[in-house]
Structure formats: C-alpha cells, structure tokens
C-alpha cells in the first residue's frame, strides 16, 4: 500500500479543512495517510512516505510564509526526495496581489528536492466550496496515479 504524509499550516482552519479533504481522498484510494500540523512536522518525515503533500496559507500583504512554516520550508530545501511524488495546495484570499504565493513557493522547493510533481497546484479562495473539493479530489487522483506509475 502506498503511503502519504500531509503537512498543513492553518490560521483560520481553512487549510486544516483542505488537509482533511486531501486525507479523505487519499484514503478512498487506499493510500495510508498521516496528517500533521506544520509546526509539529519535520521534512525528513517525507522520506518515509511515497507521497508528500503540503497545504499552506500565505500570510500578509507581501505573500509571506506563515511564521510556523519557515523552519519546515528552509529544512525542506536540504532533503532528497528522489523517487517521491509531491503535491501542494492551499487557501488564500484573492483580495491580495500575492494570492496563494506560498503554494507556488513550496512547489518550487519540492522541485529542488528531486521529487516528482504529481499534479498542478490547487489554490482555494478562502474556504473550500464544492468546486474546490472536486479540484482537490482530482489533484489527489493525479498524484496517486503518478506515484503508481513510478
């Protein structure tokens, strides 16, 4: 059975909800899942999983990493995830110019780790609506299919 590690950062609860949607979608595809809040996670935990997923929000007017995600983000740069499949999703507010910038930032760091991109990023405006849930389920299906093909 394939395994997945889902790490999330959530201030308002929106990304925790997104992580739960992702977790349920993975479980429905018979993937073993462990979900952890980012301040309690270590990027090295990804080395023990087939699938690596980050769900994060973007903080402030300048598209900053959440404070609780900075160490995880920096440490992720030093991990070799060759042979793993990754995905990044998260919520933000389209009011800001840097809507979901951190989602793109995490995707760029995953590229540096040698991991294989499983799906395009998913960006959710505020909280997940029905259409967003469909996008997240497709995101998970694509990641699992990519992992199965390795």
Locate each region found by the language model.
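FMN-binding flavodoxin-like domain, especially the glycine-rich phosphate-binding loop
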Residues: 2-3, 14-17, 25-29, 34, ...
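The conserved SAM/SAH-binding core of class I Rossmann-like methyltransferase domains
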Residues: 7, 36
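Short polar catalytic/cofactor-binding loops
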Residues: 9-13
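Short acidic active-site motifs
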Residues: 40-45
